Structure formats: C-alpha cells, structure tokens
Design a protein with these regions (language model features):
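Juxtamembrane/disordered regions of integral membrane proteins
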Residues: 1-113, 117-135
Length: 135
C-alpha cells in the first residue's frame, strides 16, 4: 500500500488548495447567507485536517485503487465523482432532514461541488500514482 502514498499526499495537498479557494473566495457568501448563524468565527482546523485525511483515504480506496491498472482515466473520474456525490449527499441530505431552515440551494451547490472536486481529485491521484509506479 506504500505505493499509493505519493498519490495520497499529493491529492490531500491538491484538494486542500482547491477547496480552500472554493470555500474562501467563491462559496463563502453562499454559506454566509444560508447558514451564517451556524458558522464559527474561526474554523476548527484540526477537524478540517482530519476530514481531508479521511476523505482522501476513502477516495484512494474506492476510486483510485480499483482503477489503478486501467489505462483509461474516465473510470477513475467517474468512481471519484460518485464517491464524492455519495459522501456530500450524505452530509447535505442529513442536514436537510434534521436542521431547521437548512437551504436546499446550498445543498445542491455543495453536492455538485463535492462531485466535481472528488472526480478531479481522483484524476490527480491516478496521474501521480501512474507517474510514481512506472515499471
């Protein structure tokens, strides 16, 4: 499993940077308008770090590893996108079901973002894995 480590680490860095740009520059007003009353003044970075470590581990296991030996990147992207959709949908649909006034629009945007980000991260992981494991 160590052969996946460079891809895992590169994907964590890539996802963190892209998600940081998304959250701080693009989606922040959406979150502020929709759930600003729930947002902490300062994010709890330790929990964010744990999320990225765990999420990318799941992405590697369910999307990259099964497609590692397949030359086509399409199956890796689709598997990653589906993984992201299922994870983000679990979060967003649970919030819609349980939290008062959780905005549907925010959930749709968040699930779309999670799907696209995860598919792209799976591609990054596959590319790094392929480059670092040439035979």
């Amino acid at each position: 499993m160590l052969k996946y480590l460079p891809a895992y680490l590169a994907t964590i860095i890539f996802m963190f940077i892209v998600d940081l740009i998304w959250l701080s520059q693009i989606a922040q007003p959406l979150y502020q308008d929709g759930i600003g009353h729930l947002m902490a003044a300062t994010p709890k970075l330790a929990f964010a770090a744990i999320f990225y470590l765990v999420f990318v581990l799941g992405l590697m296991w369910f999307a990259v590893r099964p497609n590692a030996q397949i030359k086509s990147v399409k199956s890796t992207f689709v598997a990653g996108a589906l993984f992201g959709f299922f994870v983000y949908a679990s979060y967003d649909l649970t919030n819609l079901a349980l939290l008062k006034d959780w905005p549907l629009k925010l959930s749709i945007i968040d699930m779309t973002w999670g799907t696209l980000l995860s598919g792209t991260c799976a591609l990054v992981a596959k590319l790094v894995f392929t480059k670092t494991n040439k035979t």
